[in-house]
Structure formats: structure tokens, C-alpha cells
């Protein structure tokens, strides 16, 4: 019986194969062969997989040629937007990624693929305040999203806001249940807080929360 193809599922499979299942050189060979078979039902996924394989092999221009063709037919596809962001950043043109993503993020600001790619593009473009603002809004809704905290930490570090950087690192450790490491990071943050007494008060309160969490964990 003929079953309609699930495009998103096929793209997800291609992504896993291209990025994780094969070594970089063989991934290129595999997807070049898949594209050459010209099976229409899966050709788009094979092209996408080939683009990702080219990226792993540092053949960025070849990857971009394919992704330009794919995204022209499906501009809102999250798989394609994610890949194009990586390509623009690899080419040293993160602002092109920012502009590409902007209307999609405006329409759907809570989508993690869009928000985190936009934040990454901002950081790559040295627009740290924009990245932090976007990530703060995202974390209001998805406060336990690890990658968002990691990107926040990177933005703070590159903008030399070291107290905030250590606070973001603390949140990452806490998500893993490593509360003692989280407390260490907050103590570093406290030392960088200077004369900001309100900030120090917030840090002390968070230290207490993490120590309480560690005590509860030890009692289990």
C-alpha cells in the first residue's frame, strides 16, 4: 500500500545520518549516491543530508548551493533555517542569518530552533545585548532549556559581563543536578558583582536555593 511520505521525518533521519551515523567523508559519498538514485519521494531529504555532509567536510560553498535551492521552495522549514544559519556563520556572515531569521522569530518567538539560532547568530555578529535580550525572553517561557543558558553564558563572557556569565553557568550545572558546582559558579559571580548590593542579594538567595536542593538530594 502506498503511504504518503512524512517530509519532516525524512529530514530528521537524513540529519541524523549526515551528522552522527557516518564519518564525514563517507557521509558525503552516501548522500551523493542517494541523490544520484533520483528517488523523487526522498530526493529532498537526500539533498538536505548531502548539504549537511558537505558542511561536515568543510565544503561550505557546495552546501550553500544545495540549501539555497531547498530553502527557496520552503522558506519556513526549520531544518533548512537551522542549516542556513550554520552556513552563514561559517562564511563569516552572521548578519545574513539574523536577517533571514528575523521575520520567523517575530512570528514565532517561542520556537526553540528559531530563537536559539537567532541568538547564536547575534553572538557571532558581536551583538551580545541583542542575544541576551532574546535569550531572556525565551527563558521566561522555557527556563530549564540548557542550550539557552549556555548561549547566555557565552554572550556574557564575550561582552565581559563576568558576574552574569558565572550565574548562567550555575544554571547549567543546576539543570544537571550538580548543585555544588552551581554554588561554586555563584560564588565567582558574587566576587564579580562589585558594589551592586541588589545583585549580591539575588546571588546569595540563589546560593541558598541550590544548597537546599543539594541537601534534599542527599536525603534521597
What are these regions (language model features)?
Residues 1-102, 178, 194-195, 199, ...:
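Extracytoplasmic and endomembrane cell-envelope/extracellular-matrix remodeling and assembly machinery
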Residues 30, 66, 100, 134, ...:
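Alpha-helical solenoid repeat scaffolds, predominantly canonical TPR units
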Residues 34, 70, 103-104, 137-138, ...:
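Canonical positions in the second alpha-helix
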Residues 62, 96, 130, 181-184, ...:
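Extracytoplasmic/secreted proteins, especially bacterial periplasmic and envelope-associated proteins
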Residues 73, 107, 141, 158, ...:
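Structural marker of alpha-solenoid helical repeat scaffolds
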Residues 78, 82-159, 163:
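Alpha-helical adaptor scaffolds
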Residues 140, 167-195, 208:
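TPR/TPR-like (Sel1-like) alpha-helical repeat modules
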